[in-house]
């Protein structure tokens, strides 16, 4: 995923030589299931010394059930850069977001449409008030990093906006908390960025759902590979998936393909997911 999606404090951390960072993501979740679960994202971030930090823009589109339910959002963020010393820097980020959810009621099927002999042929008498709802949302985060390690904390959906098509005040987007960190270890014992291993962990919590991804990147020249394990905890806890990545990098450009292999009880119906990223 885009770094600024994980933590708004990461805005500006990808700048190199005064330039910015563009990241594009496409994810197809469980393509073997009926319907589609597709997420597309595009982000840009850049550091500006004149304003003491970085800015970011993130556009997200999520589609479920062959367009039955869609969500779009646009987020803009700023991270304040605070050098602690020559080797270690802190960043404090904030982000504002406008989001919109839409539902295509015509693709839903209701009980009163069923004819015992002919199936779904009748017109429904169900009434709905709206097919679209918009909301304003906010996030904040903190990041500490050096050349060889990083760690961060972030909180999303701070205002817990209502996302109900019927105005139900209880249908909120719950707060999401994220903790993440990692190391960059040169494999030849010297400061050689061409050959490194980077163990990392990401921990997310949202209401009763808790998830941890743990694994590593391996970089050798232009080659980038990685392997992670995803575990969920609590009421919905299980060993969820293995994730593998292969890609390459050239100067500032990176391209990667990742493959999720489900290892939980859902693997028979939803064995795989696929994601492509470039930036």
PLM feature segments, named:
Residues 1-279:
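Subset of outer-membrane beta-barrel
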């Amino acid at each position: 995923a885009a770094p600024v999606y994980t933590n708004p404090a990461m805005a500006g951390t990808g700048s190199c030589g005064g330039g910015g960072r563009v990241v594009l993501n496409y994810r197809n979740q469980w393509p073997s299931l009926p319907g589609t679960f597709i997420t597309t994202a595009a982000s840009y971030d850049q550091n500006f010394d004149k304003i003491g930090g970085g800015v970011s823009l993130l556009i997200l589109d999520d589609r479920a059930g062959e367009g039955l339910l869609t969500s779009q959002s646009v987020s803009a963020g700023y991270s304040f850069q605070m050098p602690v010393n020559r080797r270690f820097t802190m960043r404090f980020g904030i982000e504002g977001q406008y989001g919109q959810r839409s539902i295509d009621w015509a693709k839903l099927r209701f009980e009163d449409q069923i004819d015992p002999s002919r199936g779904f042929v009748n017109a429904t008498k169900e009434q709905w008030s709206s097919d679209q709802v918009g909301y304003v949302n906010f996030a904040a985060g903190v990041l500490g990093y050096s050349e060889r390690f990083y760690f961060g904390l972030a909180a999303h959906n701070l205002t817990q906006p209502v996302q109900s098509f019927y105005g139900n005040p209880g249908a909120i987007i719950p707060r999401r908390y994220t903790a993440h960190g990692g190391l960059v270890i040169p494999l030849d014992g010297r400061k050689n960025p061409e050959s490194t291993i980077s163990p990392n962990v990401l921990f997310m919590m949202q209401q009763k759902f808790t998830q941890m991804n743990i694994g590593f990147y391996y970089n050798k020249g232009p080659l980038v590979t990685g392997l992670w394990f995803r575990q969920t905890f609590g009421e919905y806890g299980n060993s969820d998936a293995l994730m593998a990545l292969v890609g390459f990098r050239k100067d500032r450009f990176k391209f990667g393909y990742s493959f999720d292999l489900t290892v939980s009880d859902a693997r028979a119906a939803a064995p795989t997911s696929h994601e492509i990223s470039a930036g």
